[in-house]
């Protein structure tokens, strides 16, 4: 028998049916109705096992609504009646995740998974690793924050660091408990999971949309995302969204379960929906067996998945492996082969990117691939077109690589028409007519016009400049930038800060309010960081991580501007190609003029001078654990990095020192086991003072 998760009574009492109070006691009657409706909600939306007919549920629901209307003092925040939606929002506020929502690395072939298992085994110095395996849902990643057991906030993944607050809409998802089913909830619990729409629910939604003359959704993921991002939560409430929990962010006031499988079992006890399609296996053989079994079952599943996920099961081992870049070393997504379809190439055009890259693009007869209608597909570069021998008129195999980016895989020889036309790379840019050039050691051809002559490069460069990870100018999208460039209102990024209110308000699809918002966003963007500014400049080969390293190494813009190629090569992870690209960009008078104009416009950031003195911790790796008496972890890390040291997230044989504070956990034990030098805060500060 299914335990009663809604009662705070003992397990022995959990299965008892509470006595039904009559209407003479409204408070008791309302409490009983809430319990009954929550119980039936859980059976229907989480267990997928309806316990009463819909008509009986509706009868109880209407009775509770009537009671709460006549006795407003009985209304509580987590009443089932409060899931119907609230008044529309004007926008979704931003939420900074306490623990970043990281992405996973991908594997596509068996060899990728075997290699992953070997990396894990080597990293743990162990064989036959125990893994937790689960499905990779094709929905929208969400973080649910519970405080003292109550749902207080829900946010989308966003860029991993910052998402959108969709709490009002999430409250309408009946599968998600508004209160955890426990008498002893954690102080803070961040539940990570996926919001999705079942295939059958999508079919019903599209039927309603057709009848109402509304927009139909191509696939369940689009429907889930579109429904969750409705500013009017009453619309969200009308759409059947589901949720599965699969991960954790912040946890305070409770002990972390020892394994991922134990975490999911705990979630189920708390009343959170957890997918039953999961297992604990050992080694690469167990992973591949799970993948094969799920692949065979995939067509019969009620929801869309695009792969499976493998995670090292033991939390202690996860912590030992740590992270690389923006992904954990202890987990990987094993993607299913991308869906493919046949269509014809109606033409091949070239697109010009922000760095002048010329990319051939196949214009295709519309075809449905993986639930999405595809009309264009990348051909990457001229050499790739030649290698695959793609011609206009060909019947081709189109694949959504990684189920996202459409690409042409190959042509079908027996279907090639006699009048098929080979692709001819133009000699001049289709946008500005500048010569197209191609260096001997590069596969990509480029427009030589630069952003001064080429409108396509200007548009691409400006869109990059205002993007979220660069200057983060909200409201400046493709259509607006296109108008500004095409109407010759702006030429460079510096011109953005010279824009007047009237010039913006008179553009198509703009009004006074929108123009005011863009003006405010531009003003706000002037206060930035050196790393963001460097990244926003769009220097070829300089991504986010490289921009951060440059800012950290040089400390201020002037030092970077004066740096030689040799000095640039001293920066972590910068090689000759990147150093030459940076030096070439900074040697161009037009680029230097742009930087000066941006600073004159008021773009600013905090700078610090990097002192040219020995780095005593160079080559040393530190791990921080526990709570230090006076320094936060960030402050301790800054001091270590300023002295040339590296701060890692996990302990290994390569660790030089472990800095331990109060409540140090498994990292301290691991350090003692490996014989690594352990420092407290005072010893760390003394070590730093010794070298000053």
Swiss-Prot record:
Binding-site list for Zn(2+): 429, 432, 447, 454
Residue positions binding NAD(+): 54-58, 103-104, 134, 157, 194, 311, 335
Keywords per UniProt: DNA damage, DNA repair, DNA replication, Ligase, Magnesium, Manganese, Metal-binding, NAD, Zinc
One cellular-component annotation, GO: cytosol
Disulfide bond entries: none
Region entry Disordered, spans: 1-27
Pfam family, one: BRCT
Annotated Polar residues bias: 1-14
Protein family membership: Belongs to the NAD-dependent DNA ligase family. LigA subfamily.
Alphabetical list of NCBIfam families matching this protein: dnlj, PRK07956.1
Protein name in the entry: DNA ligase
Native source species: Janthinobacterium sp. (strain Marseille)
Gene designation: ligA
């Amino acid at each position: 028998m299914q335990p009663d998760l809604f009662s705070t009574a003992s397990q022995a009492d959990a299965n008892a049916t509470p006595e039904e109070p009559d209407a003479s006691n409204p408070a008791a009657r309302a409490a009983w109705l809430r319990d009954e409706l929550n119980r039936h909600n859980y059976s229907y939306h989480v267990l997928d096992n309806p316990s009463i007919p819909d008509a009986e549920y509706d009868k109880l629901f209407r009775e509770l609504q009537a009671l709460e209307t006549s006795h407003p003092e009985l209304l509580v925040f987590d009443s089932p009646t409060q899931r119907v939606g609230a008044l529309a929002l004007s926008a979704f506020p931003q939420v900074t995740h306490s623990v970043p929502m990281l992405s996973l690395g991908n594997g596509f072939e068996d060899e990728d998974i075997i290699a992953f298992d070997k990396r894990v085994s080597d990293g743990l110095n162990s064989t036959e690793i125990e893994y937790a395996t689960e499905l990779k849902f094709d929905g929208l990643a969400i973080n649910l924050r519970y405080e003292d057991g109550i749902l207080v906030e829900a946010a989308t993944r966003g860029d991993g660091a910052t998402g959108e607050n969709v709490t009002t809409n999430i409250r309408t998802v009946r599968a998600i408990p508004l209160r955890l089913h426990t008498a002893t909830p954690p102080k803070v619990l961040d539940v990570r999971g996926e919001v999705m729409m079942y295939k059958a629910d999508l079919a019903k939604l599209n039927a309603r949309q057709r009848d109402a003359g509304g927009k139909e959704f191509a696939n369940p993921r689009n429907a889930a995302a579109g429904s969750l991002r409705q500013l009017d939560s009453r619309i969200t409430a009308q759409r059947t969204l589901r949720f599965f929990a699969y991960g954790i962010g912040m946890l305070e006031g409770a002990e972390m379960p020892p394994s991922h499988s134990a975490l999911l079992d705990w979630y189920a006890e708390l009343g959170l929906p957890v997918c039953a399609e999961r297992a604990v296996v050992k080694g690469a053989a167990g992973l591949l067996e799970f993948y094969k079994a799920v692949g065979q079952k995939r067509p019969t599943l009620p929801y869309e998945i695009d792969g499976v996920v493998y995670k090292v099961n033991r939390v202690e081992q996860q912590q030992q492996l740590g992270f690389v870049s923006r992904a954990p070393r202890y987990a990987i997504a094993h993607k299913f082969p991308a869906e493919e379809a046949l269509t014809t190439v109606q033409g091949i055009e070239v697109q010009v990117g922000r760095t002048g890259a010329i990319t051939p693009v196949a214009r295709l007869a519309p075809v449905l691939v993986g639930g999405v209608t595809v009309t264009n597909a990348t051909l990457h570069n001229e050499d790739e077109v030649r290698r695959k021998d793609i011609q206009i008129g060909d019947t081709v195999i189109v694949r959504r690589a990684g189920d996202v980016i459409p690409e042409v895989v190959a042509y079908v020889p027996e279907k090639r028409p006699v009048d098929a036309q080979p692709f001819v790379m133009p000699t001049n840019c289709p946008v500005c007519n500048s010569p197209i050039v191609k260096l001997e050691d590069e596969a990509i051809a480029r427009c030589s016009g630069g952003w001064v002559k080429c409108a396509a490069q200007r548009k691409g460069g400006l869109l990059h400049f205002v993007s979220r990870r660069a200057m983060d100018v909200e409201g400046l999208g493709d259509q607006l930038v296109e108008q500004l460039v095409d109407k010759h209102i702006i030429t460079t990024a510096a011109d953005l800060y010279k824009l007047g209110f009237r010039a913006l308000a008179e553009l198509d699809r703009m009004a006074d309010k929108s123009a005011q918002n863009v003006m405010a966003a531009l003003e706000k963007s002037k206060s930035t960081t050196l790393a963001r500014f460097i990244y926003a400049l769009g220097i070829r080969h300089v991504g986010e991580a490289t921009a951060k390293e440059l800012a950290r190494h040089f400390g201020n813009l002037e030092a970077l501007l004066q740096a030689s190629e040799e000095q640039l090569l001293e920066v972590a992870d910068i090689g000759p190609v990147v150093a030459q690209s940076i030096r070439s960009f900074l040697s161009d008078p037009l680029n230097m003029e742009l930087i000066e104009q941006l600073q004159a416009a008021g773009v600013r950031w905090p700078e610090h001078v990097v002192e040219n003195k020995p780095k005593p911790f160079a080559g040393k790796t530190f791990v921080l654990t526990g709570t230090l008496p006076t320094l936060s972890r960030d402050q301790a890390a800054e001091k270590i990095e300023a002295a040339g040291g590296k701060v890692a997230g996990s302990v290994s044989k390569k660790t030089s020192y472990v800095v331990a504070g109060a409540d140090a956990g498994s990292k301290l034990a691991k350090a003692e086991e490996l014989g690594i030098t352990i420092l407290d805060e005072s010893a760390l500060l003394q070590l730093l003072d010794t070298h000053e």
